């Protein structure tokens, strides 16, 4: 039994040894096949870890709920009714967006602006490391203390439509971890502006926006102006051209308290093309037509009383235009607008031209009555030579030329006795006609009578022509010609007078 048990134990040991060797070999090959996969998975996990590390380096990982905790932390330490301790410096930046218009009659300017205010409040600081790396946050303005900075010369303030919508939700201020607060908002302000109307419509205006604190003096709040002006969002105005935007820091006393103030001065120049085209040019055309109508000679016989009506009509037109301008500009008792002065000048010129027409009509009427001016006035108007010249022809009698004289006398019975003298040297009549030639002489006399009747008819025609010439001379005598020269002279004089001012105005435009 002892040997048998020993053999059984030996056989069992051998079988178990073989089984263990087989399982070890299989596990070895299994492990050798899985090893590359495990190594690859390990390498992949390392690369993914590096990528996550890089992402975390570029974008800080915020802890959820940090913004809420930060807001609660800041509001718990801050009192909206308590200003920061010590002297507070406020940097004020104003960006001009658009000039909505200038009301000359009310002396106001309306502008659209963007406002940025910067100040530091130590009670609104935090450590970004304690709040998930947050370096800035936003809190509504009605939850923190804000300096009471207003526009001192403001007449009216209008809120924008989208600004009203935002105010119903919240008006946030940007707060940085070091306590710097940035408050931005758009606004439409109507400010008072002293309008100088002396050179209207060629005027330049300067309007200021005065920024200051209402309750705090400069021992508590000092304003600092941002000098770099950005006109990136500026939209040009069709009537006003922006010349310059100047910023200055000033001080003034308000109710016994010295206050720090920032003044934004806007320099503008009016674009006068609209007024030149709609008012100045029509006024010039009316004056020029009136002057030409007053002095142009369309007739030399009729009177010209109707031209006074034309002059009065032009004067009334100038008065209406001046009223149109006076309704737009302020009613000042110190200065007269340039455009109104131009209309008054035209009224005076047309009035003087109408009175001058009366003088010309008086001179013309003297000519129609047949009066003649003196040689002095004729020479003054270049109607006669200035220097006298003698054009008389000299005649000399030729003693050798015979002269015949026919003496005609009328007898009672109608007979005509004709005597012929041959020379003036006292030669007597040689002989009396023979009776034999009497019949021939009578025939000759009959022909002479017919000839005389023809001459008489021709003389009557000459008299009629002389009468017509006399009438013509009466209508174009010296005074009439002088009146013509006066018409031409005054027409060019007054046309030049009304043309030069409008040419200067258009040149300055």
UniProtKB/Swiss-Prot annotation:
Which GO terms of type biological process are on file? chemical synaptic transmission; defecation; lipid transport involved in lipid storage; monoatomic ion transmembrane transport; positive regulation of intestinal lipid absorption; positive regulation of striated muscle contraction; regulation of membrane potential
Record keywords: Disulfide bond, Ion channel, Ion transport, Membrane, Receptor, Signal, Transmembrane, Transmembrane helix, Transport
Coarse class of the protein's main subcellular location = membrane
Q: Which GO terms describe its cellular component?
A: acetylcholine-gated channel complex; neuron projection; plasma membrane; postsynapse; synapse
Q: Which Pfam families match?
A: Neur_chan_LBD, Neur_chan_memb
Q: Which CDD domains match?
A: LGIC_ECD_cation (cd18989), LGIC_TM_cation (cd19051)
Q: Which GO terms describe its molecular function?
A: excitatory extracellular ligand-gated monoatomic ion channel activity; extracellular ligand-gated monoatomic ion channel activity; transmembrane signaling receptor activity; transmitter-gated monoatomic ion channel activity involved in regulation of postsynaptic membrane potential
Q: List the disulfide bonds.
A: 193-207
Mapped to this chain, the residue ranges on the Cytoplasmic side of the membrane are 357-487
Signal sequence coordinates: 1-21
The UniProt entry lists membrane topology as: Multi-pass membrane protein
Per the entry, what this protein does is: Forms a proton-gated ion channel with pbo-6 that is activated by acidification of the posterior coelomic space, leading to posterior body wall muscle contraction (pBoc) during the defecation cycle. Probably by regulating the defecation motor program, required for fatty acid uptake by intestinal cells. Does not bind neurotransmitters such as acetylcholine, gamma-aminobutyric acid, glycine, serotonin, glutamate or choline.
Record's subunit section: The functional channel is a heterooligomer of pbo-5 and pbo-6. May self-associate to form homooligomers with negligible ion channel activity.
What the record says about family reads:
Belongs to the ligand-gated ion channel (TC 1.A.9) family. Acetylcholine receptor (TC 1.A.9.1) subfamily.
The name this protein goes by in its record: Proton-gated ion channel subunit pbo-5
Specify the species: Caenorhabditis elegans
Gene encoding this polypeptide? pbo-5
């Amino acid at each position: 039994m002892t040997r048998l048990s020993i053999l059984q134990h030996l056989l069992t040991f051998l079988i178990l040894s073989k089984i263990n060797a087989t399982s070890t070999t299989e596990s070895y090959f299994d492990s050798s096949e899985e090893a590359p996969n495990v190594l690859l998975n390990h390498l992949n996990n390392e690369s993914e870890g590096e990528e996550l590390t890089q992402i975390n380096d570029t974008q800080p990982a915020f802890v959820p709920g940090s913004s809420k905790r930060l807001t609660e932390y800041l509001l718990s330490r801050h009192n909206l009714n308590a200003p920061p301790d010590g002297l507070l410096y406020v940097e004020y930046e104003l960006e001009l967006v658009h000039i909505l218009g200038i009301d000359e009659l009310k002396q106001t300017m309306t502008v659209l602006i963007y406002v940025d205010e910067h100040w530091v409040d130590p009670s609104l600081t935090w450590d970004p490391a304690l709040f998930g790396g947050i370096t800035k946050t936003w809190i509504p303005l009605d939850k923190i203390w804000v300096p009471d900075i207003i526009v001192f010369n403001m007449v009216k303030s209008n809120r924008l439509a989208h600004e009203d919508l935002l105010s119903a939700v919240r008006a946030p201020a940007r707060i940085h971890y070091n306590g710097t607060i940035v408050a931005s908002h758009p606004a439409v302000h109507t400010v008072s502006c002293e309008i100088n109307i002396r050179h209207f419509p060629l005027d330049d205006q300067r309007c200021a926006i005065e920024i200051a604190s209402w309750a705090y003096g400069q021992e508590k709040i000092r304003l600092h102006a941002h000098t770099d002006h950005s006109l990136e969002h500026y939209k040009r105005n069709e009537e006003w051209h922006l010349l310059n935007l100047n910023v200055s820091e000033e001080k003034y006393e308000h109710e016994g308290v010295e206050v720090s103030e920032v003044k934004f001065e806007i320099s503008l120049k009016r674009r006068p093309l609209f007024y030149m085209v709609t008012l100045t040019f029509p006024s010039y055309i009316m004056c020029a037509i009136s002057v030409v109508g007053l002095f142009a000679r369309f007739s030399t016989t009729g009177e010209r009383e109707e031209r006074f009506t034309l002059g009065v009509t032009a004067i009334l037109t100038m008065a209406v235009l001046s009223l149109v301008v006076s309704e737009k500009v302020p009613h000042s008792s110190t200065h007269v607008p340039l455009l109104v002065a131009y209309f008054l000048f035209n009224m005076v010129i047309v009035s003087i031209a109408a009175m001058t027409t009366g003088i010309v009509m008086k001179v013309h009427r003297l000519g129609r009555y047949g009066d003649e001016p003196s040689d002095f006035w004729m020479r003054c108007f270049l109607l006669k030579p200035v220097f006298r010249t003698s054009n008389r022809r000299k005649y000399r009698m030729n003693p050798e030329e015979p002269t015949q004289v026919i003496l005609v006398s009328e007898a009672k019975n109608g007979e005509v006795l004709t005597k012929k003298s041959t020379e003036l040297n006292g030669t007597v009549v040689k002989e009396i006609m023979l009776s034999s030639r009497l019949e021939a002489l009578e025939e000759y006399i009959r022909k002479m009578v017919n000839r005389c009747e023809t001459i008489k008819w021709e003389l009557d025609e000459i008299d009629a022509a002389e009468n017509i010439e006399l009438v013509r001379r009466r209508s174009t005598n010296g005074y009439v010609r002088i009146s013509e020269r006066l018409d031409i002279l005054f027409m060019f004089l007054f046309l030049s007078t009304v043309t030069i001012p409008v040419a200067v105005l258009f040149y300055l435009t």
